[in-house]
Amino acid sequence: MSQNIGKISQVIGAVIDVEFEPGKLPPIYNALRVTNPSIDDKENNLVLEVAQHLGENSVRTIAMDSTDGLVRGQAAIDTGKQISVPVGRKTLGRILNVIGDPVDEMGPVGAEKEYGIHREAPAFVDQSTKVEAFTTGIKVVDLLAPYARGGKIGLFGGAGVGKTVLIMELINNIAMQHGGFSVFAGVGERTREGNDLWMEMKESGVLEKTALVYGQMNEPPGARARVALSALSIAEYFRDEEGQNVLLFIDNIFRFTQAGSEVSALLGRIPSAVGYQPTLATEMGELQERITSTNKGSITSVQAIYVPADDLTDPAPATAFAHLDATTVLSRQIAELGIYPAVDPLDSTSRILDPQVIGEEHYAIARQVQYVLQKYKDLQDIIAILGMDELSEEDKLVVARARKIQRFLSQPFHVAEAFTGAPGKYVELKDTIKGFQEIVAGKHDDVPEQAFYLVGTIEEAIEKAKTLAV
């Protein structure tokens, strides 16, 4: 079969127009290949994805790599299929880019099968409706906003409040305890963090169970807008063909939206609210609906979601909210108190915080903890104006317990050992419930609040109190 070859007619940043002969337009999402000598000396090293048809013989495409050095009239070859990435066990322990090429200098992937990155979401009849929680070993999450197996979890937070550290701790805890496969999509984040994650995974022995797919901050918007889909295709293979329970980590889903908005104006779309692309909800829906549990296996996804200027009503985080089963909101106010993980116990929510799923005891204690913290929040204005002495004895007790709960919600992380000097702690759910139940019941009213800071179980807090008393 003769190749369908077009010619570049216009280059505007990451968007390239290609002309074909009449009747030979490639379909939307098809991959075209062009030789760009400024990337490297290989043939057909630049992939373009067809995004629009312009009239009868021209397409508008998005480039997956640098377009510097391209010229008008250059040949673009239609591959006849969409961007495909290698899938299967050979991808484990490897770092791939958006088009599935390895970037870890460890030779070709050698996978037997490839999946296209644009795939249909599973049909309703194939989706599983079973609801069960899975334990992360992080107290604040397991108690107040538990994660559902096969669910979608969002980590919301502004810049520098600890989203990436929390994701790395989850990868560490879940890979150690859960033993299944993980896929990590680095979408538009810092290359340094991607490198750190790879090194840490190597050291902890988790790497051989994880596939890493990176499209980092320094890459063109085309790569950042598609890399999450590439990672998702790898996860779908493990779910559908091997019946695995896969974990998909995306850091950061906001960059997926941001990359879409960068190319949207160049594609000639009129921007909508706050300058985002008009197709924001559709693009997010196409990605999120593929992340689900089926009768064969499940994909549980944990997504870091950057919140621009700490504004949760911004269209990008607000659109992501609609798809989530649990939200873990990281708060700058809590980070300022030195409490890490800086999870807001009152803003974080979970669909499965329900006595029928997690049991009556867990539910009751979670609600009591939230009640005490909410009461403390309500009293803070009075304390700020009049001081603690003006409170009733009952309110003073509530404040003392709330401050202990607040500190007990902190926890030393394995991945932060280098910074804190404290060994990381994985806390079993039963120990978490027991600890908070004892604080709320007033068993530890005589223990100083510092004893609860950065410990694992309640027993450790009591031991720490003994050393403080000396």
Curated annotation (Swiss-Prot):
Reaction equations catalysed: ATP + H2O + 4 H(+)(in) = ADP + phosphate + 5 H(+)(out)
Residues bound to ATP: G157, G158, A159, G160, V161, G162, K163, T164
Localization in the cell: Cell inner membrane
Signal peptide coordinates: none
UniProt keywords, alphabetically: ATP synthesis, ATP-binding, Cell inner membrane, Cell membrane, CF(1), Hydrogen ion transport, Ion transport, Membrane, Nucleotide-binding, Translocase, Transport
GO terms assigned for molecular function: ATP binding; ATP hydrolysis activity; proton-transporting ATP synthase activity, rotational mechanism
Pfam families: ATP-synt_ab, ATP-synt_ab_N, ATP-synt_VA_C
GO cellular component: plasma membrane; proton-transporting ATP synthase complex
EC number: 7.1.2.2
Keyword presence, Ion transport: yes
Family: Belongs to the ATPase alpha/beta chains family.
Self-association state and partner proteins as the record states: F-type ATPases have 2 components, CF(1) - the catalytic core - and CF(0) - the membrane proton channel. CF(1) has five subunits: alpha(3), beta(3), gamma(1), delta(1), epsilon(1). CF(0) has three main subunits: a(1), b(2) and c(9-12). The alpha and beta chains form an alternating ring which encloses part of the gamma chain. CF(1) is attached to CF(0) by a central stalk formed by the gamma and epsilon chains, while a peripheral stalk is formed by the delta and b chains.
Protein's name according to its UniProt entry: ATP synthase subunit beta
Record organism: Geotalea uraniireducens (strain Rf4)
